[in-house]
Amino acid sequence: MEHPTPETGDRLASGEAFGALLQSFRRRAGLSQGTLAKLAGIDPSYVNRLERGEREPPKREIVEALITALQLPPDDADRLLVAAGHLPRALQHLGPLDPTLLLVADILADERIPAEERRQFRQQIALAALRWRPQTPIP
């Protein structure tokens, strides 16, 4: 395993978290590392090194190939993308500069607004989302 330096330490730590999540999803799918690698079009030794945290999280294209090979549902796909340091699919599609998303994020991050009011704002957003996503948890 590569020895962490100040420059690589954080990336390898995130690689370990990504690897653990990847391994969990692979096992849940009942796939061997070799089968997952074949389905994703990558080398089996690369899957092994990813799972062991010996590689930095991969580029988005490889994560997307792993998601497809694992047949992950949307929530798990986003978890794997985020663990690799990528935006979830909805944010990737909308773009991180979507004005509505920025406004919501700005309000939720504004510590001048009392925590209880920010919690209520989250609840209002979740309630509004129920119209299109009935499974939305209410914070």
What are these language model-derived features?
Residues 54-68:
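Short, basic-rich loop-to-helix N-cap that marks the start of a DNA-contacting helix
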Residues 61, 74-100:
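Short amphipathic recognition helices of helix-turn-helix/homeodomain-type DNA-binding modules
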Residues 108-139:
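C-terminal regulatory/oligomerization modules of transcriptional regulators
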